[in-house]
Amino acid sequence: NEKYDGAIRLREGLAKSKNLVAIRVLKHIDPKYALDYITRFGFDQKKHSPYLSMALGVGQVTALEMVAAYGVFANGGYLKQPYFIEKIIDVKGRKIKQNFSLTNEETPRIIDPRNAFIMNSLLKEVINTGTARKAKIIKRSDLAGKTGTTNELVDAWFAGFNQDIVTVTWMGFDQPKTLGKHESGSRAALPIWIDYMRPILKNYPMRELETPHGIIPLKINPINGLLAEKNENSIYEYFYDEFLPMENAYFLLN
């Protein structure tokens, strides 16, 4: 957006789609490690390259792959394979074939439930304060997701979910070309998602992902991310219990 916001937290960077935040995270963990890691989510390693551009979504994915991947954050860490056809019946109503959703116990858990919980929380911020805040019109607190826009506005994405439903919308041309000025994920793909999900969600009660054991909410200084002093402005953030911030801003200044 041609605006420099200075140092910001990962939560804020993700919500506002700040590319440099994602690039620095990827650089820290190493692109080769990330390339191996994404195969857990069902992505084809051959369609991605171990470079920093991975952080910007450079690579080839399908909407169905995205549904499976975001489902991991929705259900607490399990990889479930989506399917197109639930049931086939003949003209006499006899069932010829039926697909069934596997339970969590029947599917592999590919990430720590704490990881899934924190990612769920971060992706909620995208709707609460970030690029997908238009989705607040649905008036639910259990929605999370992420907008996506490729170079030259060729593709517009929105992947959004709650515990019951994952929906991914994509807009683009069969033969890649620009969608037009300002046709980003939040402008082109998100409205489709809202129109589709709003009536469907009326059939599902709001459910928040349960906080797993080993997650600690702490008050931190929003500027530096360290523990907050008692009387200073602060916000809550979630941490693994083995990776709690041990220092506060006052300690560092003195």
Region locations from a protein language model:
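Structured segments of extracytoplasmic/periplasmic soluble domains
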Residues: 16, 20, 24, 28, ...
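Acidic/polar loop patches that form or flank catalytic/metal-binding clefts of enzymes
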Residues: 79-83, 128-135, 200-215
